[in-house]
Amino acid sequence: MTAQSNITPESIVGDLRYLQLLSRSFPTIADASTEIINLEAILNLPKGTEHFLTDIHGEYEAFQHVLKNASGAVKRKVNEIFGNTLREAEKKELCTLIYYPEEKIQLVKAREKDLDDWYLITLNQLVKVCQNVSSKYTRSKVRKSLPAEFSYIIQELLHETSVEPNKHAYINVIISTIISTKRADDFIIAMCNLIQRLTIDSLHIVGDIYDRGPGAHIIMDTLCNYHNFDIQWGNHDILWMGAASGNDSCIANVIRMSMRYGNLGTLEDGYGINLLPLATFAMDTYADDPCTIFMPKMNFADTNYNEKTLRLITQMHKAITIIQFKLEAEIIDRRPEFGMSNRKLLEKIDFERGVFVYEGKEYALRDTNFPTVDPADPYRLTDEERELVEKIHYSFMNSEKLKKHMRCLFTYGGMYLVSNSNLLYHASVPLNEDGSFKHVKIRGKEYWGRKLLDKADQLIRTAYFDEEGEDDKEFAMDYIWYMWCGPEAPLFDKDKMATFERYFLEDKEIQKEKKGYYYTLRNREDICDQILDEFGALGPHSHIINGHVPVKTIQGEQPMKANGKLFVIDGGFSKAYQPETGIAGYTLVYHSHGMQLVQHEPFQSRQKAIEEGLDIKSTNFVLEFNSQRMMVKDTDKGKELVTQIQDLKKLLVAYRIGLIKEKV
């Protein structure tokens, strides 16, 4: 008995208004039947390949390369298709062309004597690769991915076989005509971009696009134009969202971070933030101060600065750091419920003796020059500092590019995501020592587990979108800063952020940040199951996917925790963490055959990738192998399609029994 025969007239009467609306899209029995056939066919295709990346931290070249080579999938497919029929050097050339078509074509033109012959060979090779990567999709989906100007021609090439002599001649004529009409360059570029697009069906960024590295704005440009992606906000992303919302403490933090790593590109080139007022203030205020402890970490910088510029960045770094401490104290005083009064540390300095006094113990200060700090009122901004804060605030609030990128972060992002039974969030779900969910009080009401992350998500959106001057907006603006460094914030979940201690004190013990219980308890399978149940991520193949804490692979730490229930995939995209991790990042890949982790070696440079064919060396580890290939019907999208099919079957019954008339 079919599902349709179970649909009775009585069962569809309640849905009649909806079915009448549906009939506008499918006005006849033939239309509805055709759509049912199409959707049933889609359900039985293999699921698309999902890629999970986290903690990119502005490393745009490595990030873009991983997207272009699909974490090694393109190279693997080229090897599968051409095997021993191409030499290794030829396969490497083809892969480089697929990754960087515009640049590679120019190099080929400079060296190739018979360009038309190269075009002919290359176009045939690209057609084979394209046929392979498009084979798991419907023709309709592939068609929607095609560039308009070449849509018809690419469809002809993809869906015709060259085995039959007539078809072989037909394909050759198409390719020859592309070459003779001088369209080969554009066509090759279109084919390469299509291969890149079809190899990754969906992309999940599990937080921390921003800070440390040089090109977060370039990563955001790439994402804003990407075909299918989502973002789970990280603590560094939240900091920039707070800055874009107008929180001056967040603004000071993002500037300080840029100075610390010597990467000003995102601020100045990306968002047009005017740092001249800060430079002028810093030069005047710290003219005779060596500011030694504020020297940027130049081994991670995007530019080789001359001595004069380096000196200026060092002064600016100190200036904005002191301003940050003052601005944060204003929030701490305004929000005693945050319980962060112990982070007001300027008042604990004995300025006369140059020591820091904390809990009865004295610590020598590494820097004792505080020209803008009044010992009697250490958190009061000087008139010059207040004016500077206003100027920088104006610059952040009027950056159109920043607004565009923040809208993208809000539209495609959130605190967490449940996708195909996987639960994605950047850092933590706060827990008590016994493993129960920690109850966190926000404005007098307690939240925990999923409700806590939902509330945080709502407050972050309120901070950015709500009307100025509203009480809810003011609280949300302060809370977005708390999300960055608050002890009970799910994106931080440590007892303190020891920024002051790391700058000013030598003692390593006082610099330690004690992690919340989540970070140890997540190694237990029962705890992970409890969290998965809380968020409705059900099924035998459900997992938690985290970033935030770098996996110290070099020390033997494994990214897989809790008997395979949880994956931590921060492998060190950020160059600052590569000495700790020993590698340069992970990609988690979830395809129809199962899950695998791709471990990346450091990326040399885009230039070397183009000129020398240097790919990222990646190692694959199978984490989970499906005994039966996973189909679209097994995914979240499949569940949606099943519901659509059921509705269309109801519409068919409504047509056939006369409840709705066909519109022939």
Curated annotation (Swiss-Prot):
Any GO molecular function: fructose 1,6-bisphosphate 1-phosphatase activity
GO biological process: gluconeogenesis
InterPro entries found in the cross-reference section: FBPtase_class3, Metallo-depent_PP-like
Native source organism of the sequence: Bacteroides thetaiotaomicron (strain ATCC 29148 / DSM 2079 / JCM 5827 / CCUG 10774 / NCTC 10582 / VPI-5482 / E50)
Reported cofactor(s): Mn(2+)
Keyword DNA-binding attached: no
EC annotation from Swiss-Prot or TrEMBL: 3.1.3.11
Metabolic or biological pathway, per its Swiss-Prot or TrEMBL entry: Carbohydrate biosynthesis; gluconeogenesis
Protein name: Fructose-1,6-bisphosphatase class 3
Keyword Manganese included in the entry's annotation: yes
Reactions this protein catalyses: beta-D-fructose 1,6-bisphosphate + H2O = beta-D-fructose 6-phosphate + phosphate
Pfam families to which the protein is assigned, alphabetical: FBPase_2
Alphabetic keyword roster: Carbohydrate metabolism, Hydrolase, Manganese
Family: Belongs to the FBPase class 3 family.
